[in-house]
Amino acid sequence: MANCKVIAVTNQKGGVGKTTTTANLGIGLAQQNKRVLLIDADAQGSLTLSLGYPKPDELPVTLTDIMQNVINDTPIPDGCGILHHGEGVDLLPANIELSGMEIRLINAMSRESVLRTYINAVKPHYDYILIDCMPSLGMMPINSLAAADSVIIPSQPSFLSAKGLDLLMQSIAKVKRQINPKLKIDGILFTMVDSRTNEAKEIIASLRAHYGEKIRVFGTEIPFSVRAAETSGRGKSIFAHDKNGKVAAAYRSLTKEVLELERKTERFRVDAAR
């Protein structure tokens, strides 16, 4: 793969499986021999915690320091702040200090592209960079969308989650118009799906009908599972925790869909260049 693809995993609603998806998709891609960097762009540090760093506030270098260096135009040494996870992915961690970055960005030069500046510098080392976005529509998520090639939107199949999707679509469209014209939506991913309930089935069917013509809805659905919830904070992916379970199978399937998307894009690029 010649180019590094940057994917923002985003939804302004919390608790929809963003962090779990970022970690497991990233590790799924690493299992397919892709070089992967995961960026925790959420001040709660959920991705950092879930990958086995229980005290993110004690880490010497986090995304906040990296972004501050970009703002100050200070050189960033190769590999600075990057942690190597046992399942083959790299992590740029975050902690509560990132909440102050929102305020600092307001007065920064080229404030929307601070994260993009850093990502462009590390792109040559990776095939995929996945960003776990903050659940808001502030300056940090805008930085993530400005840096991304595409967006994956995890969403629970509930009416409240569905209502929030339209607002998120408007924000993505605005970033695309004003800051990052190449930004596209890879798809909506249904997470925490309890297929036993009729409500979930009805909402999924109506959302597939509503968005399906304009926006891809991934064929893979991530099922609700107590075992998946247990992995959070253990520092392991679902593959290491329960490799034969239904959630691991679903994330393997999602990984295949994401890789196939890239193959189609690559084929289209080659055909267009002929």
Predicted stretch roles:
Residues M1-R274:
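P-loop NTP-binding core
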